[in-house]
Amino acid sequence: MEQHEEAAERKPSPPVIFRLFGVEVRGGGGGVDEEEYEEEEVEGGLFIKKSSSMPNLTSIDPLPVPADGGKRRASDDSELASGQQKRRRRKVQERKKGVPWTEEEHKKFLEGLRQLGKGDWRGISKNFVTSRTATQVASHAQKYFLRQTNPGKKKRRASLFDVVAECSDDQLPSPQSVGTKPPTQDIIHTDRGDVPILSYPVARGFRGDSVQVDELTEYVKRLKAAEDMSLSMISGLEMASSSISSLELSIAPPHCAIEAAIKVL
């Protein structure tokens, strides 16, 4: 009996095997060979068991300690962030930097503005300034109009708009010169006679930034007055012609009256 008890005590219990994160881990039982483990003394007089299948713990080099003792400065982070911001700002400036307009392109722009008028930037870009897009033409026009509406500023740097605008003022008629021209008479030939009609010059080539509301209103009033005058003259001629025709019908011709008198006799 004693021998059986000693054999049972010596018989190792089966090890407990479980899987942890895909790795089989043995524990619990005494069936693990003692040869696989060896004791190693570490600092402080402590002993740990390590497996022979694992790499030597003492062969692992300690992590290098930085010169500043592991202390990071906040200024380093701020310098890094400022450097990144400067690079981004430089890239944005390079992207936004465009090619300046030449004098020839600006002259073509003024010619297109004179013929097509303000607002047709797509037509100016397509037919006149072909080297620029419609968006670029609209931006250039905005700068041009701002420059023209504020011409009296002192100590202002010379610009392309000023140089070309002086050359192109002779081609663009001013609203004062167009509005003060005397009206011309157009004669309409009719069956009842010649009818004179007053005609005012058509306001073409006006620049949108220099035309005043009062001048446009006065111009429209003159056109309306001339139209009313022409209609009244035409209606007067029609009434006169109708009255003349009625008189001709009511009055008998003289030879008809003589023939009637002869018959009576």
UniProtKB/Swiss-Prot annotation:
Induction notes from the record: Induced by sucrose. Slightly repressed by gibberellic acid (GA).
Q: Which residues bind DNA?
A: 121-145
Q: Where is the composition biased (Polar residues)?
A: 50-59
Family matches, as Gene3D superfamilies: Homeodomain-like (1.10.10.60)
- Where is this protein found? Nucleus
For the region Disordered, what residue ranges are annotated?
29-101
Residue span(s) of domain HTH myb-type: 93-149
Which terms under GO biological process does the entry name?
positive regulation of DNA-templated transcription; response to ethylene; response to gibberellin; response to sucrose
Kindly state the positions of the motif Nuclear localization signal in this protein: 71-78
**Gene Ontology cellular component?**
nucleus
Residue ranges, compositional bias (Acidic residues): 32-43
SUPFAM superfamilies recorded for this chain? Homeodomain-like
Q: Which SMART domains does the UniProt record give?
A: SANT
Q: Where is the composition biased (Basic residues)?
A: 85-94
**Matching PROSITE patterns:** HTH_MYB
Please provide the record's keywords in A-Z order.
Activator, DNA-binding, Nucleus, Transcription, Transcription regulation
Q: Which Pfam families match?
A: Myb_DNA-binding
Task: Mention one GO molecular function.
Answer: DNA-binding transcription factor activity
State what this protein does. Answer: Transcription activator that binds to 5'-TATCCA-3' elements in gene promoters. Derepresses weakly the sugar-repressed transcription of promoters containing SRS. Contributes to the sugar-repressed transcription of promoters containing 5'-TATCCA-3' elements.
Q: What is this protein called?
A: Transcription factor MYBS2
Q: What organism does the UniProt record list as the source?
A: Oryza sativa subsp. japonica
